[in-house]
């Protein structure tokens, strides 16, 4: 076959295949249920990680007297994320819209992107996961991205919840500069456990509303 004929044949095949290639290049829409299940799983994993690590750190290094004084003192038990208004009970949670709960969850996750790096050594020393390559910061980033995707999918044209003012960790860290590293990590872990529990609760609530048959799962 002449060179010109080969060129025409190749061009014809390419043109015939073009619509198929274009169709195949488009990613199918990810099911909403999968997005929710992934986000809930990640939030649960982070909460469980903190829940399992906290008593081990406490038992190994924190004297009982120091523990009780810490819990009774509103200054030391106050978390830097308290500046983010969150529902304090089930009734208040149910009064929030899906987008509001997702936005609050997003703010809580974002507030931890800086301080969680101080907890890496705590989690590494106190076990819990068998994957030595686990990176808690990257895991938080994945959860942040997942929540942002859910917000985009649930956006119905209603105005987004405005940015809520929150104190930075740097301000909190300055106020606690007299604490030794161990006590500071203890306080951080205490707050991280509380906040991840909130995020998991809020995500489960929204999933229950948005995905049929997912309540209690």
UniProtKB/Swiss-Prot annotation:
InterPro entries: 4_helix_cytokine-like_core, Somatotropin, Somatotropin/Prolactin, Somatotropin_CS. PROSITE patterns: SOMATOTROPIN_1, SOMATOTROPIN_2. Residues 1-26 form the signal peptide. Keywords: Disulfide bond, Hormone, Phosphoprotein, Secreted, Signal. Disulfide bonds join 79-191, 208-215. Belongs to the somatotropin/prolactin family. PANTHER family: SOMATOTROPIN, SOMATOTROPIN,PROLACTIN. This is Growth hormone variant. It comes from Macaca mulatta (Rhesus macaque).
């Amino acid at each position: 076959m002449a060179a010109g004929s080969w060129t025409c044949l190749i061009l014809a095949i390419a043109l015939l295949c073009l619509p198929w290639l274009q169709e195949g290049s488009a990613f199918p829409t990810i099911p909403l249920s999968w997005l929710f299940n992934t986000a809930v799983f990640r939030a649960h994993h982070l909460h469980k990680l903190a829940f399992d690590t906290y008593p081990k750190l406490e038992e190994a290094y924190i004297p009982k007297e120091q523990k009780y004084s810490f819990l009774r003192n509103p200054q030391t038990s106050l978390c830097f994320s308290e500046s983010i208004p969150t529902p304090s009970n089930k009734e208040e949670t149910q009064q929030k819209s899906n987008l509001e709960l997702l936005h609050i969850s997003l703010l809580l996750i974002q507030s931890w992107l800086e301080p969680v790096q101080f907890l890496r050594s705590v989690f590494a020393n106190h076990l819990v996961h068998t994957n030595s390559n686990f990176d808690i910061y990257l895991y938080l980033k994945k959860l942040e991205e997942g929540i942002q995707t859910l917000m985009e999918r649930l956006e119905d044209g209603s105005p987004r919840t405005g940015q809520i003012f929150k104190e930075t960790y740097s301000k909190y860290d300055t106020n606690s500069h007299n604490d030794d590293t161990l006590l500071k990590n203890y306080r951080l872990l205490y707050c991280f456990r509380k906040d991840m529990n909130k995020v998991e609760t809020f995500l489960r609530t929204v999933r229950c509303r948005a995905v049929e048959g997912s309540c209690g799962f």
